[in-house]
Amino acid sequence: MTGDGDSTPMKSYLRRLSVRSNLTAEEQEAILALPGETLSTAAHRDIVRPGQLTTFSCLVVDGLAARFDQLSNGHRQISALHIVGDFCDLHSLAVPEAGWGIQSLTPTVVRLVPHDALRKIISAYPNVAMAFWRDTVVDNSVLAKWLSALGRRDATARFAHLICEMGLRYEHVQLGTRERFAFPITQMQLADVLGMSSVHINRVLQALRGQGVLETRGQVFHILDRRRIEKLADFDDAYLLERKNRTS
């Protein structure tokens, strides 16, 4: 773990915020100047453990992380995916004791931003506080969509909805487009997220390929027919609060 005063780790987060919040130049500079330590971890390592009392929030700088719930028997369920530019647990500023865990799914780099620094910036800049709040609303909206997908969508729609969502999220932080993006997740991890077996995931993927809707090359997902996959998924991006959907 090393200290890092460079603003670069915060740039992707600023891009994410700017999708749905108007920030002044001064506010942007304050966000870029947030201090923190950089932690590099191998895949499948816990970054925050359930029940841990935290004094920081984790920003993903590189890789892919997941928030998870852990049962008393040790079994885990992924409840959120966090890409570059995501704060995994900005809400820990209000509730420091983790009721969840955060794990790296790939080799991952995170920025540990002290809660004290976050408190100072939201005290000094109320508009930044509102941007942070809006950001946590998006996290909750994503979770709500995942829950409805698990309960009410068939396997193909569930898979298609996640792919549509991830394309937009990678586009927001300028790491791809909504049609083409690198998504470093395994079929087993997808199975956990979507409540299916890895065999079922493979069947759905093959079916979408066969229909000419989706192409994959390694970790790169290429949506060949955006309109069709959105129809399959019944996808409406309003829950991601893009700027076009905002009134203020």
Give, region by region, the residue ranges found by the protein language model.
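ATP/adenylate-binding site constellation spanning eukaryotic-like Ser/Thr protein kinases
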Residues: D62, V84, P107, H115, ...
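Cyclic-nucleotide recognition modules
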Residues: A80-S141, K145
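Phosphate-/nucleic-acid-contacting segments
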Residues: R169-S248
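Short aromatic/basic micro-patch
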Residues: T38, L81, L112, P184, ...
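Cyclic nucleotide-binding regulatory domains
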Residues: R45-P107
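Polybasic "coupling" helices that flank or enter modular domains
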Residues: N127-G195
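Cyclic nucleotide-binding regulatory module and flanking cytosolic helices
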Residues: M1-A43, F87, S92-A94
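Short loop/turn motifs at secondary-structure junctions and domain boundaries
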Residues: A30-I31, V48-G51, L175
